[in-house]
Amino acid sequence: MAIMKTTLTLALLLSLPALAGPKEELSKPLTTIVNSVRYGRDNAALKLFAAEEQGKLLVADSWAKGTDAQRKEFQDLFLTLFGKIAFPKIRKNFENLDTILYDEPAVDGAKASIASTILINHPLKKQELKVKYQLVKQGSAWRVVDVAVLGDSMLIGIRDDQVQPILKEGGWDALLKAMRDKAAELKDVQLK
C-alpha cells in the first residue's frame, strides 16, 4: 500500500509541469530571456524572439515585396543588432534586479500578451518598471514579438524612427546595407 501511495504521489508531482497554467507557460520564456541577458547568455535569449513576426511588424507592407533571402538576412541582422545594442544596456539595469511580478496573460489563439512589474533594487534608488510583452506561439513554444516599457513599444519605435524612413528612401537594398554597415561598426561587440 505504501509503495502504491508513493507511486501515485510521484506521478502527480511529475505531471505538475504539464498542468502549468497560461501565466506560467507565458512567463517562462520571459524569465529565461531576462536571466540569459542578465548572466551574459545573449544567444540563448535571442532564440526566444520571434524574428519573422518582428520582421513583419518592422518592415510592414514591404515585407511581402522582399525576397526570401532578403527577409532571412533582415531577421538575422535585426536579432544580431538588437542583441549587440540593447543587451549590454539591459544587463546593466538588471545588475540590481530584485524580482519580476507577472500579471495574468491575455491569450487569443496563438497570440498572447502579458504584463509585468520589474523591481530593481538599486542601492541609490528603487525602481519599478512596467513592461508588457507580446508573444506568439510557434510550434509548442511561446516567442517574444515585442516589448513595451512604460507603454512605449520597442518595435514600433524602431519601425517608425529607423526602418521605415530607410525603406521609403531606398527600399530593401538600402535597409539591408544600413543594417550591414551597423553590424560592421559593432563587429567588436560580442554576443555571448
Protein language model regions, located:
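N-terminal secretory signal peptides that target proteins for export/translocation
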Residues: 1-3
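Sec-dependent N-terminal signal peptides
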Residues: 6-16
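Alpha-helix boundary/capping residues
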Residues: 14, 52, 61, 78, ...
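Catalytic domains that recognize anionic headgroups
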Residues: 19
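Early exported N-terminus immediately downstream of N-terminal targeting peptides
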Residues: 22-93
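Surface-exposed, charged secondary-structure patches
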Residues: 75-79, 83-130, 179-192
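Short beta-strand edge/turn micro-motifs at domain boundaries
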Residues: 128-158
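Low-complexity, intrinsically disordered terminal/linker segments enriched in charged
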Residues: 147-192
